[in-house]
UniProtKB/Swiss-Prot annotation:
Name under which the protein is recorded: Small ribosomal subunit protein uS12
One Pfam family recorded for the sequence: Ribosom_S12_S23
Native source organism of the sequence: Rickettsia rickettsii (strain Sheila Smith)
PROSITE patterns: RIBOSOMAL_S12
Residues with PTM 3-methylthioaspartic acid: D89
Lineage, opening ranks: Bacteria, Pseudomonadati, Pseudomonadota, Alphaproteobacteria, Rickettsiales
GO biological process: translation
Protein encoded by which gene: rpsL
Gene3D superfamilies in alphabetical order: Nucleic acid-binding proteins (2.40.50.140)
SUPFAM superfamilies referenced in this protein's UniProt entry, alphabetically: Nucleic acid-binding proteins
Keyword annotations: Methylation, Ribonucleoprotein, Ribosomal protein, RNA-binding, rRNA-binding, tRNA-binding
Highest taxon listed in the record's lineage: Bacteria
């Protein structure tokens, strides 16, 4: 426990919180260029081939980013937008690629949760009476 004099001289230091997505440098999104597209297997007890991409961000950092949704159009040298967000069963993957931004198309035929997958709203034909 500090003395009163120590508190007057130095004060109390507030603890700094560690960020979960340090490569974004406090930005909500960062653009980058896709270097490699690959599939990885998740931790136990899950089983799948999850799609991830290695991305070089605009601040020269290289990160692994998850590609959400079914089917994707991500290729090498594509410009991508990266947001934070961990994938629970993939160690070392702390970022997501935003679908429907830059060179990446949204998921086709998506009807629910469209904004998460960059899917456009289906046009409804209007009939006149």
């Amino acid at each position: 426990m500090p003395t009163y004099n120590q508190l007057v001289r130095f004060g109390r230091k507030s603890k700094t919180r560690k960020t979960k997505s340090p490569a974004l440098e406090s930005n909500p999104f960062k653009s980058g260029v896709c270097l490699v597209v690959k599939t990885v297997t998740p931790k136990k007890p899950n089983s799948a081939l999850r799609k991830i991409a290695t991305v070089r961000l605009s601040n020269k950092r290289t990160v692994n980013a998850y590609i959400p949704g079914e089917k994707h159009s991500v290729k090498e040298h594509d410009r991508v937008l990266v947001r934070g967000g961990q994938v629970p069963d993939l160690p070392g993957v702390k970022y997501h690629i935003v679908l429907g931004a830059y060179d990446i198309a949204g998921v086709k035929g998506r009807k629910q949760g469209r904004s998460r997958y960059g899917a456009p709203r289906k046009q409804v034909a209007v009939t006149k009476k």
